[in-house]
């Protein structure tokens, strides 16, 4: 399996969703559940880092009158 940080965002999210689904089913032996949880935490961290990187890129792209404009993406998403 590819290292978590090397996975594209979409693939990491798919794997994370699959892990969560399996853990929620409750049919996983304890040791396997712990390993799956650790893998899920790694995937979650990787996705978070990728989102932060994209947010910084978007902040740099968004210009107004030639000036860099900070954008709060959460507020804009809710509008």
Swiss-Prot record:
Its EC number is 3.1.11.6. One of its GO terms (cellular component) is cytosol. It is an enzyme of class 3 (hydrolase). One of its GO terms (molecular function) is exodeoxyribonuclease VII activity. The keyword Nucleus does not apply. It catalyses: Exonucleolytic cleavage in either 5'- to 3'- or 3'- to 5'-direction to yield nucleoside 5'-phosphates. Its main location: cytoplasm. It is found in: Cytoplasm. Keywords: Cytoplasm, Exonuclease, Hydrolase, Nuclease. GO terms for biological process: DNA catabolic process. Belongs to the XseB family. HAMAP family: Exonuc_7_S. Bidirectionally degrades single-stranded DNA into large acid-insoluble oligonucleotides, which are then degraded further into small acid-soluble oligonucleotides. Heterooligomer composed of large and small subunits. This is Exodeoxyribonuclease 7 small subunit.
């Amino acid at each position: 399996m590819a290292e978590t940080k090397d996975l594209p965002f979409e693939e990491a999210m798919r794997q994370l969703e699959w892990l969560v689904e399996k853990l929620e089913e409750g049919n996983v032996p304890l040791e396997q559940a712990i390993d799956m949880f650790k893998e899920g935490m790694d995937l979650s961290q990787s996705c978070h880092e990728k989102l932060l990187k994209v947010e910084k890129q978007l902040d740099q792209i968004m210009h107004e009158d030639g000036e860099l404009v900070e954008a709060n993406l959460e507020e804009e998403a809710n509008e």
